[in-house]
Amino acid sequence: MTQIIPSLNGLRALSIFAVLISHIQDRSLHLQTSSGGQIGVNIFFVISGFLITLLLMKEEERNRSISLKDFFIRRSLRIFPVYFLLLFVYFILQNLSILDIPAGSWLTSLTYTRYFFDGEWETGHLWSLSVEEHFYLIWPFVFVYLKRKRITFAWSIIIIIPFVRLFTNISFMHHMFSRGDAIMWGCVFALYHQPLTRFIKAKPSYLMVLPFLLLLCCLASKKIFHVVGNDSTLYHVLQAFAGSYGTLTNICIGFITLISINYKHNLYYRFLNTTLMHHIGVLSYSIYIWQQLFFSEHIGPLSTFPYNIILIFVVAIISYYLVEQPFLRLKNHFIKQKPSEEPTAVPVLSTTP
């Protein structure tokens, strides 16, 4: 038995819209790119850390232990099929002389280290999946074997990484060492979700708009911070801690996630949980995987707006129902219940970049 956490697929839908709009601005309309795409990716990161940590907490509570083997099998069934299908399609297109992907991109894409290589457009988005995959390789072990140090580890990451962004002048923004704190903020909000939920519910409802307003300020951060001069120390401090993928952005996303789940009697909640938003959220991983190809100049008329957007959704739907869904069904075989207990309703929404 599974329980769908409300609003999260709606948030995923908003995230993928932000990424698509950013790419439409840049690749199709040749306009100055907004920061919406970066914030969209950070929403994916925060939600991913939040859900993975909740799942680990639920499994530990239910079974008094966590099966790392089952965890990695579930993650592999979720992430790998569509990811490697994309690379297989790229391989075919390269052999047809449609794409020209360098060896470095192939190597880093196949090994989930894409953020180490500044390559071509078509595999450029896979950096975020590399970040997430490395999170999967670290956090579950910390959670299982360093139980008393979980919170210390999480706080250490989210304190250190903003200073990495600062002292590198954010010169590698698509990197585990500059973006990993977004996922860890999701973990922290999961670890503290009960007291934070009580805190939110105890506050006047009109205050719930505050993280949304602050996130809009982060979205406009480049223009706002421009007044202090792009080369000034203050500018880099502001970008590292309050920019479009800075600390303030991640905190706002964390609170927005909890607000979106718990404040149910308003238009915003109903909007996030409409059938359309739910289904787009379900498709968001496939949309993210395939959208890069349809913004590529190498595929000719197929990349023309708005036809490319239609193609993205068509391919994502086919990909989800023919590839993702069959593997997702297999995941249920690796969710164990204690035989002496009734099945607990576990939130098993899949995580995406």
Where do the protein language model's features map onto the residues?
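Functionally critical transmembrane alpha-helices in membrane proteins and complexes, commonly lining
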Residues: 4-58, 79-82, 113, 182-183, ...
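Membrane-proximal cytoplasmic C-terminal regulatory module of class A 7TM GPCRs
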Residues: 273-276, 327-353
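Transmembrane alpha-helical segments and their boundary/interface "anchor" motifs
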Residues: 38-41, 45, 58-93, 105-108, ...
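Aromatic-anchored segments of alpha-helical transmembrane domains
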Residues: 17-24, 92, 113-115, 158-168, ...
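Solvent-exposed interhelical
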Residues: 133-160, 191-208
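Alpha-helical transmembrane segments of multi-pass integral membrane proteins
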Residues: 209-326
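Interfacial loop-to-helix transition and helix-capping segments at the boundaries
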Residues: 6, 30-41, 120-131, 167-185, ...
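Membrane-interface helix-loop-helix regions
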Residues: 73, 79-131, 162-166, 235-237, ...
